[in-house]
Amino acid sequence: MTDSHVPHPESPAVEEGEERPHRRIKSFVMRAGRMTEGQQRGLDQGLPLYGLSLTDAPVDFDQVFGRAAPRTLEIGFGMGHSLLEMAAAAPEHDFIGVEVHSPGVGALLNGVLTQGLTNVRVYDCDAIEVLNRCVADNSLDRLMLFFPDPWHKSRHHKRRIVQPEFAALVRSKLKVGGVFHMATDWGPYAEYMLEVMSVASGYRNQAEDNQYVPRPAERPITKFERRGEKLGHGVWDLKFEKVD
C-alpha cells in the first residue's frame, strides 16, 4: 500500500495554497481481462485498419469512411455484439464505436474482419474525450448508450455518465433531428435518465407518453437481455430527439 501523503514521483508537487488541478470523474473503471485468440487477432489486425486515435481537431468522418452517410456513434459497446449486428444489417450507415476495454475492442474488430465490414471504426479511449476532441458539432445522426454502468450506490451516482452536462454535450454533437438512444435494465437508473433528459434543453422525448419507448426493432437483443427477460427483469429504452 502506498502512503497517500507521499506525492507520486511522476506527479508535480502542489505548493501550499495552490489549487490542485480539477480531475474529471470518470464513469468507467478499467478492468483487466484475458484475451482470447480471436480478440487478439482483432486488436493485432483490425486496430491498424479500423482504429482511430484522439485528435486535437474534429475528424472528417466523410474522409475516414470514404463517403457521406448517416452516422451513428455508440458509447461503451461492450463485446460489440449489438454494434456488429447493426452494422451488418445497415451497410449504408456508418458506425463509430467507443470502448475502453481491450477484450471488447478485440471482439468487435475480430467480427468486423470475419464479416468483411467496412462501415465500422473504433476508438479505444474515453468517450468524453472523443466527443470533445474528435466529433464535430451537429454531425451525428444518432448516439447510442446501451446498458451503461448504473453505479447503484448513492455515493457513486456522480459517476453515472448521464448527467446534465453530458446531455448538453451529446446535443451539441447531434444534428437537428438526431436521436440520443439509451437503454438500461436497472429501473432506478431508467427513472434517473428520464429525469435528467426531460429537463435537458433542446430535446424532445419520442415516447408518446413522455416516458419510455417500446423496444426499438433496430436494437438487437443481447444474450444477457434474454436471460434477464426469462427472470422477469425489465429493460427500458429512452429516445430523445434534438429539436434545436
UniProtKB/Swiss-Prot annotation:
It catalyses: guanosine(46) in tRNA + S-adenosyl-L-methionine = N(7)-methylguanosine(46) in tRNA + S-adenosyl-L-homocysteine. Keywords: Methyltransferase, S-adenosyl-L-methionine, Transferase, tRNA processing. The keyword Ribonucleoprotein does not apply. Pathway: tRNA modification; N(7)-methylguanine-tRNA biosynthesis. Its EC number is 2.1.1.33. It comes from the Bacteria. GO terms for molecular function: tRNA (guanine(46)-N7)-methyltransferase activity. The active site is at residue 149. GO terms for cellular component: tRNA methyltransferase complex. Catalyzes the formation of N(7)-methylguanine at position 46 (m7G46) in tRNA. Substrate binds at residues 153, 185, 222-225. This is tRNA (guanine-N(7)-)-methyltransferase. S-adenosyl-L-methionine binds at residues 74, 99, 126, 149. It comes from Pseudomonas savastanoi pv. phaseolicola (strain 1448A / Race 6) (Pseudomonas syringae pv. phaseolicola (strain 1448A / Race 6)). Belongs to the class I-like SAM-binding methyltransferase superfamily. TrmB family. Residues 1-24 are annotated as: Disordered. InterPro entries: SAM-dependent_MTases_sf, tRNA_(Gua-N-7)_MeTrfase_Trmb, tRNA_methyltr_TrmB_bact. SUPFAM superfamilies: S-adenosyl-L-methionine-dependent methyltransferases. The keyword Mitochondrion does not apply.
